[in-house]
Amino acid sequence: MYRIIAVDLDGTLLTSENKITKYTKEIIQILIQKKFYFVFASGRHYIDIMKIKDSLKINIFIISSNGSKIYNLDNNLIFSDNLDENIASKLCRIKYSDKEIITQVYQNDQWYINNNKVENNFCSLLSSLQYKYFYPDDLNFKNISKIFFTSRNFQKLHILKRKIINFYGNKVHVNFSIPGCLEIVSGDHLKGYGLKLIANLLGVSLKNCIAFGDGMNDQDMLKVAGKAYIMKNSDPHLKIALPHLEIIESNDNDGVARCLNKIFIENNKEML
């Protein structure tokens, strides 16, 4: 019997306008009342996810920065895995002067960027956090949970991905959350590890976990869950990597909520 529902946010639970629809909110509320545990698993900063959680007025587990930080139902940090300081220092410098690529950093409760080119459209629209500018020589590289590079020049990002993988190997995990956003976290602990930790904490088998995602940064979580679905709007590479998974409706068509309703609520329509 499924007890844990793990859901990615951008491209999965959230619409393209970064909103949660009324229908999705209703389904989540019903399942919370039915004693299901929700896990919001995202590349976003913890503060961003907390604001989404608070808007729903529910208690959930949080996996933030692609697994670097994990929080329990009481909003307490129960796991943390930051990037190696030397690696973080080099990554912050590698494309700092490239005007086509924005270097972005999550450190503790802060969000730093090297420049804000409006045409990249990957900054303030995706976050409720306020970013600050950073200079590599002035930044302390401790407690950096994630570094990510955003650009409209996808070819440059793919070249950068190969360069980072070739240089650092399994010391880091490098993947795209969306085509124009290349994310780097510690190589040891990802969303899948976070789901394992939470399931173990609750005494729930991974077989009783259900997961939803749309990006390559969701792949390991989708693999470890007992049941997993990918979105119609998913990254084509994810569909190729996990061809056995069922594809559900898109994030703009309440794909997650419709699937959950079909599985858990459809026989009790009077509840809706």
Swiss-Prot record:
Its cofactor is Mg(2+). Its EC number is 3.1.3.-. Phosphate binds at L9, S42, G43, K191, N217. Disulfide bonds: none annotated. It is an enzyme of class 3 (hydrolase). The keyword Endoplasmic reticulum does not apply. Mg(2+) binds at D8, D10, D214. Keywords: Hydrolase, Magnesium, Metal-binding. One of its GO terms (molecular function) is phosphatase activity. The active site is at D8. Belongs to the HAD-like hydrolase superfamily. Cof family. This is Putative phosphatase BU028/BU029. It comes from Buchnera aphidicola subsp. Acyrthosiphon pisum (strain APS).
